[in-house]
């Protein structure tokens, strides 16, 4: 996990942030939702996730979109929209930092790439590109082990709400990764060979972490 410490930190902070988002917004209990302490902890983890690497911004956005969609589906958005709004303040530090960098001409290419469509469009209709990306992302040995543990844990102890939450997070993250790799200005195989194993750490940790959490989870109703 820590072979590439920044990626290891992203994985840990993302897993922790996902747990905090789940227990504060998604879980059917008021125990965490009524305690300011958990919101402060969530703010610290959310903010740290965005500041470690640019990838963290997308990961936190995924958590917010997932929570929003699940609450919308359950028709509970009106009740929790204010909580999502307060938690979204955690984006403010990275927005201010990016604005500062932009004003100083630092890291301009990190978030503005005018050639994205130029590289993306020619690769969209080539099925081989999707096969290569799927091979590097989904057939990683550690990812498969973590996924199997996750599935077995939910087979042993089914939790529909938690499973749906992690499944949506996984799907959105995979779609973003496909977009990023298809739009890379570098050779696709070389890009995957040099970076795929690092980004998969986040998914591997997510599945392993929530597989273990599911097995030990006890609902608190007060």
Regions found by a protein language model. Give the residues of each.
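Hydrophobic/aromatic-rich transmembrane helices and adjacent perimembrane loops
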Residues: 6-13, 58-59, 190-215
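Multi-pass, polyprenyl lipid-linked donor-dependent membrane glycosyltransferases
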Residues: 1-16, 20-21, 52
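Membrane-interface transmembrane helices that cradle and orient dolichyl/undecaprenyl
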Residues: 17-38
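Membrane-interface alpha helices of multi-pass inner-membrane proteins
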Residues: 21, 37-54, 62-65, 92
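Transmembrane alpha-helix segments characteristic
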Residues: 41-42, 160-186
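Membrane-lumen/periplasm interface segments of specific transmembrane helices
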Residues: 61, 69-73, 80-157, 170-178
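Hydrophobic transmembrane alpha-helices of multi-pass, membrane-embedded glycosylation machinery
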Residues: 18, 59-73, 215
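Hydrophobic alpha-helical transmembrane segments
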Residues: 39-44, 57, 61, 83-88, ...
